[in-house]
């Protein structure tokens, strides 16, 4: 039987289950760049076309014409505070309400091409963590929304001087005398935690980093007054990331470059790699700083949005945890201050801006929102690439990174309306 030939706007694409599907006429994002290839999918995963041809000796049940679009892995956002009116740091004593808000954000992210994210909780009280964290169980992407990679806890173990918009009264500036006991008291279980941002100069921080690493949690250094030395010690202890590079840390100084100096540290080795999140929205990070990061350590660059509840909403007053935020255009400011308080930029916007600011090729920008964050979190065997065996979570975009359609496990879950 000949394959059924469909366009990306066919209603059938939202219902496909165990059929053999071939995506044609697309530019596929590979490690070596964009390649004019086909993608084969069945039962939600990417197949090896050699298996189809030489072992199964079969034809596709369905062929989908991708109309020359770029087929990229779904975008991965490792720092997302909320969006669409929902703030992940706000808990109103109602588990169902919180879960409904989380589900709403996950659903809306599909229109942005985001298929996996880490819901981010800023500095909060132990009571809040104990209520929220059990509700942030990891999940895969589906027609219901983007997958949850586990929580990114940004605080409370940070520098009071570099707290940014985090509530000062909840910041914890020492993990002494018993870091593990303090962590367990503050967070409760670490089961649903994917990333912890902490300041490496705090007393007890190195032991805390080693503990987090032993639990499989990724440690990111940030919101910190640290000089380079404590940052390097953190990397040697297992920290793998810098949180929103250039923001909430010491400025670069030629005698002690602080955490920014980690980008060129001699301590970085294949055994101790380092990634850094960067907010490419034209507000948090000047284009010149983006270029410095890109040309200094391009391999570690990971795009994050740091978006807040105002993402996808109109200008006005919004919340970030217990803090009040004023949003105008792409700028979000803490009430009564000039402190930048998260972003309202989408991931496609950040990808476009990185290309514009640095002149990097689209392949690099896309890898920085797909393969690199997946590798950082250790989930690249399932997500972040279009290699054989991976989940068929991908996005069809044009050269301007306009999202045309999003697929999760091979099913179309979002279609842009012309």
From Swiss-Prot:
Sites where the protein binds a divalent metal cation: 154, 223, 244
Keywords: Carbohydrate metabolism, Hydrolase, Metal-binding
Pfam families from the UniProt entry: Amidohydro_1 (PF01979)
Cofactor(s) essential for the protein: a divalent metal cation
CDD domains linked to this entry: NagA (cd00854)
One GO term of the biological process aspect: N-acetylglucosamine catabolic process
Catalytic reaction(s) noted: N-acetyl-D-glucosamine 6-phosphate + H2O = D-glucosamine 6-phosphate + acetate
GO molecular function, one term: metal ion binding
SUPFAM superfamilies: Composite domain of metallo-dependent hydrolases, Metallo-dependent hydrolases
Record-listed substrate binding positions: 165-166, 247-248, 255, 281-284, 340-342
Active site: 306 (proton donor/acceptor)
Keyword presence, DNA-binding: no
EC assignment: 3.5.1.25
NCBIfam families the record matches: nagA
Descriptive protein name: N-acetylglucosamine-6-phosphate deacetylase
Organism: Caenorhabditis elegans
